Swiss-Prot record:
<dbReference type="Pfam" id="PF00392">
    <property type="entry name" value="GntR"/>
</dbReference>
<dbReference type="GO" id="GO:0003700">
    <property type="term" value="F:DNA-binding transcription factor activity"/>
</dbReference>
<keyword id="KW-0238">DNA-binding</keyword>
<dbReference type="InterPro" id="IPR036388">
    <property type="entry name" value="WH-like_DNA-bd_sf"/>
</dbReference>
<dbReference type="InterPro" id="IPR011663">
    <property type="entry name" value="UTRA"/>
</dbReference>
<dbReference type="GO" id="GO:0009408">
    <property type="term" value="P:response to heat"/>
</dbReference>
<dbReference type="GO" id="GO:0045892">
    <property type="term" value="P:negative regulation of DNA-templated transcription"/>
</dbReference>
<dbReference type="Pfam" id="PF07702">
    <property type="entry name" value="UTRA"/>
</dbReference>
<feature type="DNA-binding region" description="H-T-H motif">
    <location>
        <begin position="32"/>
        <end position="51"/>
    </location>
</feature>
<dbReference type="InterPro" id="IPR036390">
    <property type="entry name" value="WH_DNA-bd_sf"/>
</dbReference>
<dbReference type="GO" id="GO:0003677">
    <property type="term" value="F:DNA binding"/>
</dbReference>
<dbReference type="InterPro" id="IPR000524">
    <property type="entry name" value="Tscrpt_reg_HTH_GntR"/>
</dbReference>
<feature type="domain" description="HTH gntR-type">
    <location>
        <begin position="4"/>
        <end position="72"/>
    </location>
</feature>
<keyword id="KW-0804">Transcription</keyword>
<comment type="function">
    <text>Represses mngA and mngB. Regulates its own expression.</text>
</comment>
<dbReference type="InterPro" id="IPR050679">
    <property type="entry name" value="Bact_HTH_transcr_reg"/>
</dbReference>
<keyword id="KW-0805">Transcription regulation</keyword>
Length: 240
């Protein structure tokens, strides 16, 4: 197979298959055993080749699922208020949510301020992981006024929150005030997003408003930066 180390030759072959379109973004690679047989090498050599391609952001390894050709990062346009499902709708991929917490809690002083509610009001507290296929993409924690959504269900939060608000509740969403914060992931974030605790992530803190001025949610979203790119268009103000 030439003078290059075997693992680099295997990595080159896989890279060529991707370039020719034989392997497409999102495609699963054969198992390590199958690659061993195909190339006539040891499992250690196969793992070295795959690890190199993962480090080069060509492949991605999903724990408990396998190794895949890495898909293009999701473009998160800060000026477009769209749901997780809407951001991925043009890619025709499976998206789903795993709900970890679904409960009603009293509103402390902080939540009263963020949601513009009274001490007597209670709120929904929901935590969920958002997936593209089997890949955890984001960890979302949301608080919503119970008075606005007394009929919110676990099933709604397994799907699209915005679809429920707009299509079922017939409410009109106006805007979201957002703040993007770089931070180091907590142990929980690292575990749920399947990333290293030494890898920086981005957290989006937002407050959503209905067209009548009521706040319908306060949320915190932690994003795996391998899967997202944040874009905005800045126009220079004329000095005339």
């Amino acid at each position: 197979m030439g003078h290059k180390p075997l693992y680099r030759q295997i990595a080159d072959r896989i890279r060529e298959q991707i370039a020719r379109g034989e392997l497409k973004p999102g495609d699963a690679l054969p198992t390590e055993s199958a690659l061993q047989t195909e190339f006539g090498v040891s499992r250690v050599t196969v793992r070295q080749a795959l690890r190199q391609l993962v480090e080069q952001q060509i492949l991605e390894s999903i724990q408990g699922s396998g190794t895949y050709v890495k898909e293009e990062r999701v473009n998160y346009d800060i000026f477009q208020l769209t749901s997780f499902d809407e951001k991925l709708s043009d890619r025709h991929v499976d998206t789903h949510s795993e709900v970890l917490i679904f409960e009603v809690i009293p509103a402390d002083d902080f939540l009263q301020q963020q949601l513009q509610i009274t001490p007597q009001d209670r709120v929904w507290h929901v935590k969920r992981v958002r997936y593209r296929k089997q890949k955890p993409m984001a960890l979302e924690e949301t608080w919503m006024p119970l008075a606005l959504f007394p009929d919110l269900t676990w099933q709604v939060m397994e799907n699209s929150k915005y679809h429920f608000i707009e299509e079922v509740k017939k409410m009109v969403i106006d805007r979201s005030e957002q703040e993007i914060i770089p931070l180091m992931p907590t142990e929980e974030m690292s575990r749920l997003l399947n990333i290293s605790q030494t890898k920086p992530i981005l957290e989006k803190v937002s407050r959503g408003y209905l067209v009548d001025g009521r706040v319908f949610e306060y949320s915190r979203n932690a994003f795996n930066t391998d899967d997202y790119k944040f874009t905005l268009i800045a126009q220079r103000k004329s000095s005339r």
